[in-house]
Amino acid sequence: MKVSVLLVCLIWFKVNFSVPVEDLDIFAEEVVQNEVEKGNFSNMPDNIRRIPRGICMNTYECRIEGGKSYGFCALGFGVCCVFRATCKQEVINNLTYFVNPDFPDLTRGMSSCSLKVKKIESEVSQIRFDFIHFNLGQPNRKTGICEEDVFKITGENTTKDLIICGMNSGQHVYVDVENIDELNVEMTLSKKAVSRIWEIIITQVSFSEGSPPGCLQYFTGRYGTVQTMNFADNGRHLANQDYNICIRQEENMCSITYEPCHENAFRISPNSEDTTINTNLLAEGSGDGESDDLRESFRAIEMCNDRIILPCDTEELIMPGMFNLAPGSCNLIHCGLSLCPSGNDPCKIESSATPFNIGVHFGNSAKPVSPEDNLGMCLNYEQIPCE
């Protein structure tokens, strides 16, 4: 019996996961409670009770690789090994927590922070960043540009760097690494007395389990909520954002509805003060007015420097007192202070266009505008079964 146990221990090897965070089969027994100070972070709860995610491996490997064991896994032959990294360190595992130096306390007085993320194997095509906590300084309130605190993800051959700031707890992003070996996370922090906290789960994802091409964010499930970056009561949508939010079409689902999370959940002011144009443009797909509709489409694009794109082929607006829309009506471009035309809230937009994608296109916002009119977007979605 002793020989058998010894043999099992000698041949025990690390279980290697390369799947999205929500699908990880995680083993952990210790509950971690962080007391988080209030202040600029009023959207965060006082007490956070959470079981950390980790990789099931033997105790020796966990210790040698710099991890910390949190309970047992694999019938007691392994431990749930949790890896944490902070500034000026490297990530060399497929699941690592990147935290501020004083975590779980707030960090003050830093000017910079950097992290390298090494791809662990050639099959990894994307790196997923889950912002469990992400509270940095706000962008310029009038322009939306991240001027003081900047969080940037770069790679040698990446086509575009991700740059964000502000409050992004609960958000996530996928970054393609198919043709590169490492990513760099660079944070530039202002010298102002701003309290900051971040806790980011970094996961390495194989090609078969990642997001579709061109999707910075990827949501699954019949129901869910999507938001633009830095969407908060005292926030402002960020400038220079150009990406797609993608939603997986679930089995036996043929269409999707979008509804603002609350009455102020869609506020993206247009460039012009001209109110004679409906920025939530109703453009007929065919008919005698097609040329006029095309001209109006270009005018809407010109007006909406900051805009949301909801692709559609047959779209229905469901609003109180509005039942006379022609078949095939399509609201492609959305900006202004309401998701629906003429401010007829509450409303739902239903679309059968696939894939279920939302385009976020925010310009450089060189012209100062009211931050209250540029909170950004928060939408609840629901997929509708096929008839």
Predicted regions and their residues:
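Domain-level representation of secreted and single-pass membrane ectodomains enriched
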Residues: K2-E387
